Amino acid sequence: MASKAQNEEIIDPNGLDLFRLTMMVITASICGGIFSLAGDMAAGGANTGAVIVSWGICFIGVFALMMVFNGLSQARPDLTGGIYAYAAAGFGDYIGFNSAWGYWISACLSNVSFALLLFSALGYFFPAFGAGNNLLSIVCASVFLWFLTALVLRGVKEAAGINTIVTLAKLVPLGLFVLSIVLLGKFNVDIFMDNFWGEPAGPGFGEQVVSTMIALVWVFTGIEGAVVISGRAKYVRDVGRSTALGFAAVFTLYLIISMLSLGIMPREEMAQLATPSMAGILECAIGPVGAAIVNLGVILSLVGALLGYVIIASETPFEAALQGSFPLAFAKTNKHDAPVVTVLVSSGITQLFLIVSYVAASTYQFFYSCAVNTILVPYVCSAAYYMVIGWKNEHLDGPHAPSVGKARFFGTLGFIYTLFLVWSTGLQGVMITTILFAPAIPVYMLGERGRGKPVLPHLHDKLIAAVVIVVAVISLYLHFAGIAPIV
């Protein structure tokens, strides 16, 4: 029998086998948001039946989205500027710029979210930090942010040792949560079945399902990074397999944690838990030691992971500048080869949002909602581009390109799912998105003029820019007039 190496095309002789590749996808995909997911869904009014249906929608949609990124990476390996490069290739420079902007601002907002979650977890051990958004928390978070910024400016990269600590800090509490509830028999079927489809005076079933969408997408934000990791495969066929297996493993873990949580305490009590809610759930199951372990895991995970988030936030506009989407100044590096302009600007934006979180008393949940709203722009554009090349049968004749049928199916499904997510964000989502994207227009104009290129060359570009400005102005009026407050 011919060996596997003889029967399969090799990408990289030194690449990773299927098992190691899948493990890397799993560790890269597990998000700190899982530690607060159960409480966040409960706070939205979702009972057991709605949560189960929501997970079903999430599985179909997120898997389709992951296959979109996987298919695009194989169909267009020449586009190396990040997922926003797909928007530029399909719909022009202005759409590509907005896609890059959304990805960048989402990274900055994610930094704020995790900083607030970090100090909320610290508040369990040191009550002075409160819910993570008081003055002491913001001051300490700011100091930590600029300490990490200084490290990145000196050329520090995310180290393997830090990755190991972050991975263990996430996996140990999650494993303990599952095992302790199962082995100690703490799961209560009566609690799980109570008000299964909703409370008599509560929100309707459809409203319950929609309320969970942002929280569910948040815990899967970053799946495009898992696709990049899958590109380290030794064999061609393992690229898609590792992505699918890794996603299935992470999804199963998340689903088990979510279902077990519903059998520990009633929804009304879960909705009142402090962030991270998993700590309160495990404390209810096994006592204070459970809360201590979860909070410690969150702290260790985020202290290490925030360095990576600072790097990601700075690399996004840097790569976009190199690709021609952002102004040339964003491509400047210092003597340590660090992207000095983007590091400072990204940390400055993060700092501004930290101040806003204190002034407006905004929570971790509000900022991750904003992060999801902004990252939906590159997600929608990527899915739309994959759908377009599928139905036009373009760029699908390469040696590693997906089939036409696969591109059409997952492109269309991914596009429908991302549009559904945009709809599920509601009026608040539209207001937040336009307000955050309006400042992008002068930055785009500066970059295009610096390269001697026409600004908003197409009619649809002008229309999009005009709509963003008008809706942003209306949104600001509605907010400050108290008609539709954003926060």
How would you describe each model-predicted region?
Residues 1-52, 56, 62-70, 78-80, ...:
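Membrane-interface "cap" regions at the ends of multi-pass membrane proteins
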Residues 3-14, 52, 129-136, 168-295, ...:
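Helix-loop-helix junctions that connect adjacent transmembrane segments
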Residues 333-334, 379-470:
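C-terminal membrane-solvent junction of multi-pass transporters and transport-like membrane proteins
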Residues 84-87, 92, 124-129, 199, ...:
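TM-loop-TM module centered on a large, flexible mid-protein loop between adjacent transmembrane helices
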Residues 42-43, 63-145, 150-153, 158, ...:
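Hydrophobic transmembrane alpha-helices that form the core helical bundles
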Residues 42-50, 120, 124-137, 157-166, ...:
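Transmembrane helix-loop boundary segments of multi-pass membrane transporters
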Residues 136-187, 243-247, 372-377, 433-439, ...:
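Membrane-interface loop-to-helix entry segments
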Residues 13, 18-19, 139-142, 234-236, ...:
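Loop-to-transmembrane helix boundary motifs in multi-pass membrane proteins
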